[in-house]
């Protein structure tokens, strides 16, 4: 075998008249009777190679036996394509390789699905079972090239700005951080378990106490939680922590890094500073703590109608301290039938809304199921509040504020997709700040941390921890991109007494706090610097930069929605001997 001189996808006009050695997979083969054309593929792309008896009769005979996905090595000379055969769709489309020698390195059975088609209409489970074949597709090859470019850009930025890449343990202690832990039984310590880290949160804080000042890690994290399209049980996080900083320092660093990544990976200049919005404003205007700002259709408070109208649903809602909000779908009145509106009503029911009221704005007023409840003065109020015009569709939810936000926020996204309102070329970054420190868990009847127990409250709110914990704001911030939470961070608690107080508010006894977090509380006794950080979801960032809609497309060997690996059949049963060594017994 000869040494490869270049990749297939890099053979351009600069190689004209040069002899090259290429290695790759047969992407496509066309026998034109006397001439055989093969598209040869590798990770960089495709180049057309030609088998011509005038060039090599022996090579032509071998080419007659090759089939799709055979692995071959070819030698030949790069020539200019005839004008009528130039392919402007690919980088190598101006040239072809006249083959003088071919060697079949390995044969292939017929794949279970086509690899040489751009849009593979095949069940995802089949693709995941044969993931090594799926990854040969150019679409996915490009995705993972961009993933590499993304991580390279991140490392370059952090290295150039004085950060140390430090690894933290994978086998650690189970602590209550939100989701369920993946547990690993210890053979040496019978009946005891390690946990796989949900994040390196505590270790990166300990590194700040150790004096390392600037830390980063591109790290695997594990969470045993219910899955959806943008979640995986194991995922990659860009984890960053800094000492002697405030929120502004971390936001500035995060923006600089993300602008560099977008420039390096997509060649796009993103202007800064990124817009900011408080948590309260995001929920009020968009019904979401991760608003997609690529389009309008904001939530509008129309609770005034509940006071003016003789419509029992609206009136009762306002009388019971609820609220009424509306969204306006411009020029959509004729695009949704009553049956469509029934389907939208069922959609908001998922989010706890009892119903979806709606009217269509027409030239002489309103039409629709609740139009009869609107008197002329109410119509004018509605138009003033919503700026609705004839042809618009106005939808209302009247309920508790959190139900209104969740249901209309989700409906807003659904309608925008259906109506084609989203400019997919945009990258809209947004910081969401001033989060509540705590949330009240109705089931547990206690407060839980909105982010995690180590987030510091705003200094001016510390005294409220005892009297009105629901009104304490956190030194926390999320970075949002196109309606997805890209990452989040906070300034951490660095005072042992305040951390102990936080545990008390969360319902921990002193003994429980010491048992679970004693090592952190002890570390605070030895001079902890002020510190804070941020963690970005790498898989999600790549998904958004590559315009994918499924997180699994950005992970080489992902799990399914039920947390299984169809390629390896993990998780799987283990032998009785292995269970005995771990002092475990399975109960069915």
Swiss-Prot record:
Subcellular location: Cytoplasm
Major subcellular site: cytoplasm
Catalysis performed (reactions): tRNA(Asp) + L-aspartate + ATP = L-aspartyl-tRNA(Asp) + AMP + diphosphate
Any one Gene Ontology molecular-function term assigned to this protein's record: ATP binding
Membrane-crossing segments per the record: none
Binding site for L-aspartate: 177, 223, 451, 492
Protein's UniProt keywords contain Nucleotide-binding: yes
Swiss-Prot/TrEMBL keywords: Aminoacyl-tRNA synthetase, ATP-binding, Cytoplasm, Ligase, Nucleotide-binding, Protein biosynthesis
GO CC terms of this entry: cytoplasm
Keyword Repressor: no
Spans annotated as Aspartate: 201-204
Residues annotated as binding ATP: 223-225, 232, 485, 537-540
Pfam families: GAD, tRNA-synt_2, tRNA_anti-codon
GO biological process: aspartyl-tRNA aminoacylation
Entry function: Catalyzes the attachment of L-aspartate to tRNA(Asp) in a two-step reaction: L-aspartate is first activated by ATP to form Asp-AMP and then transferred to the acceptor end of tRNA(Asp).
NCBIfam families in the record: aspS_bact, PRK00476.1
Quaternary state and interactors: Homodimer.
Similarity-based family: Belongs to the class-II aminoacyl-tRNA synthetase family. Type 1 subfamily.
Identification of the protein by name: Aspartate--tRNA ligase
């Amino acid at each position: 075998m000869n040494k490869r001189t270049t990749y297939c996808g890099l053979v351009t006009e600069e190689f004209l008249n040069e002899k090259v050695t290429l290695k790759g997979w047969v992407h496509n083969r066309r026998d034109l009777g006397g001439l055989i054309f093969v598209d040869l593929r590798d990770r960089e792309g495709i180049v057309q190679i030609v088998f011509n008896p005038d060039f090599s009769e022996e090579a032509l005979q071998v080419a007659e036996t090759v089939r799709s996905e055979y692995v071959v090595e070819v030698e030949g000379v790069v020539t200019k394509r005839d004008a009528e055969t130039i392919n402007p769709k690919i980088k190598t489309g101006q040239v072809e390789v006249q083959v003088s020698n071919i060697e079949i390195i390995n044969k292939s059975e017929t794949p279970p699905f086509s690899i040489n088609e751009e849009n593979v209409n095949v069940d995802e489970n089949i693709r995941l079972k044969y993931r090594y074949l799926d990854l040969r597709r150019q679409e996915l090859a490009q995705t993972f090239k961009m993933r590499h470019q993304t991580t390279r850009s991140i490392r370059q930025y952090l290295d150039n700005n004085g950060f140390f890449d430090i690894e933290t343990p994978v086998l650690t202690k189970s602590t209550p951080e939100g989701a369920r832990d993946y547990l690993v039984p210890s053979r040496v310590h019978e009946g005891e378990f390690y946990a796989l880290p949900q994040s390196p949160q505590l270790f990166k804080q300990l590194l700040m106490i150790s004096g390392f000042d600037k830390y980063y890690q591109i790290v695997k994290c594990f969470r045993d939680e219910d899955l959806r399209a943008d979640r995986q049980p194991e995922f990659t996080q860009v984890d960053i922590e800094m000492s002697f900083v405030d929120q502004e320092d971390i936001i500035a660093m995060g923006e600089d890094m993300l602008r560099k990544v977008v420039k390096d990976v997509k060649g796009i200049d993103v202007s800064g500073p990124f817009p900011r919005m408080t948590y309260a404003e995001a929920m009020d205007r968009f019904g979401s703590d991760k608003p997609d700002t690529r389009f309008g259709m904001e939530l509008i408070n129309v609770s005034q109608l509940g006071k003016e109208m003789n419509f029992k649903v609206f009136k009762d809602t306002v009388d019971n301290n609820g609220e009424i909000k509306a969204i306006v779908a411009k020029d959509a009145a004729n695009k949704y039938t009553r049956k469509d509106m029934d389907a939208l009503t069922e959609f908001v029911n998922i989010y706890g809304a009892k119903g979806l009221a709606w009217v269509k704005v027409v030239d002489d007023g309103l039409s629709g199921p609740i139009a009869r409840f609107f008197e002329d003065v109410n119509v004018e109020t509605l138009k003033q509040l919503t700026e609705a015009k004839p042809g618009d569709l106005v939808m209302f939810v009247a309920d508790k504020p959190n139900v209104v936000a969740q249901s209309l926020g989700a409906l807003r996204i659904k309608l925008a997709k259906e109506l084609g309102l989203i400019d997919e070329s945009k990258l809209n970054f947004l910081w969401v700040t001033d989060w509540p420190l705590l949330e009240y868990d109705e089931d547990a009847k206690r407060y839980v941390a909105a982010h995690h127990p180590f987030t510091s409250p705003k200094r001016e709110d510390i005294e409220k921890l005892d009297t009105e914990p629901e009104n304490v704001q956190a030194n926390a911030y999320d970075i949002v991109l196109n309606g997805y939470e890209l990452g989040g961070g906070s300034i951490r608690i660095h005072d042992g007494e305040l951390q102990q107080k936080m545990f008390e508010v969360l319902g921990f006894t002193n003994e429980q706090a010491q048992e679970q977090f004693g090592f952190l509380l002890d570390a605070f006794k030895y001079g902890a610097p002020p510190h804070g950080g941020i963690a970005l979801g790498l898989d999600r960032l790549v998904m958004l930069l590559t315009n994918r809609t499924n997180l699994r497309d950005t992970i080489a060997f992902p799990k399914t929605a039920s947390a299984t690996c169809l390629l390896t059949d993990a998780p799987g049963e283990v032998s009785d001997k292995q269970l005995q060594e771990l002092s475990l017994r399975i109960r069915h």
